[in-house]
């Protein structure tokens, strides 16, 4: 496979700008429907959870390549350059959740943010996490992301509150296991 594409221009391009009232964005993508079957290198100002719904893809972050299969996922910290592409002849559908940091706490001067979240997100080695079902705490996080997906597929009034709940729960597990 030719990886020259990963050395091409790296840009910031949000999927959609988040509004001042939106705390998250969900986007379901099919790698085969993307230009050149590639999610070009980029970064986002929000946290991202990526969950593979079906198939397999190659995911790159911090000069590392990962094969990600159905039922697996990633967490990306803000500002992490990442990309994805098809792997061999596999199809791949995946969901991306872009999460505003304000989902966790409205302001960065919040004592809980300062105590639990800031040390994680500001740590230079905390750029990303992989989630695989073989690891119990990661399996639990993957289940929460699946629940978020189910809720977004059939939203009812207040569904955003459930999403916020799951995001806080995910960060609780990340904090205790990283």
Residue ranges and their predicted role:
Residues 76-77, 99:
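A conserved hydrophobic position in a structured secondary element of the catalytic/binding core
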Residues 132-178:
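An amphipathic alpha-helical interaction segment
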Residues 37-44, 85-87, 107-109, 159:
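Short histidine-centered beta-strand/loop micro-motifs
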Residues 1-67, 73, 80, 114-115, ...:
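Generic protein-terminus/edge-of-domain signal
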Residues 2-24, 85-149:
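A hydrophobic/aromatic-rich effector-binding and dimerization subdomain
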Residues 77-79, 85:
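Residue-level recognition of conserved beta-strand edge/terminus positions
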């Amino acid at each position: 496979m030719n990886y020259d594409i990963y050395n091409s221009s790296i840009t910031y391009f949000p999927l959609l700008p988040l509004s001042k009232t939106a705390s998250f964005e969900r986007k379901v993508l099919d790698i085969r429907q993307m230009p050149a079957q590639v999610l070009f290198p980029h970064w986002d100002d929000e946290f991202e959870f990526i969950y593979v719904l079906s198939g397999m893809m190659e995911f790159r972050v911090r000069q590392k390549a990962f094969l990600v299969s159905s039922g697996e996922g990633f967490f990306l910290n803000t500002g992490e350059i990442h990309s994805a592409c098809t792997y061999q002849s596999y199809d791949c559908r995946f969901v991306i959740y872009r999460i505003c940091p304000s989902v966790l706490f409205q302001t960065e001067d919040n004592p809980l943010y300062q105590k639990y979240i800031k040390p994680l997100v500001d740590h230079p080695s905390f750029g990303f996490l992989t989630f695989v079902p073989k690891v119990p705490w990661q399996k639990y996080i993957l289940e929460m992301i699946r629940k978020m997906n189910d809720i977004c597929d059939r939203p009812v009034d207040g569904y955003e509150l459930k999403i916020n709940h799951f995001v806080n729960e995910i960060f609780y597990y990340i904090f205790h296991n990283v």
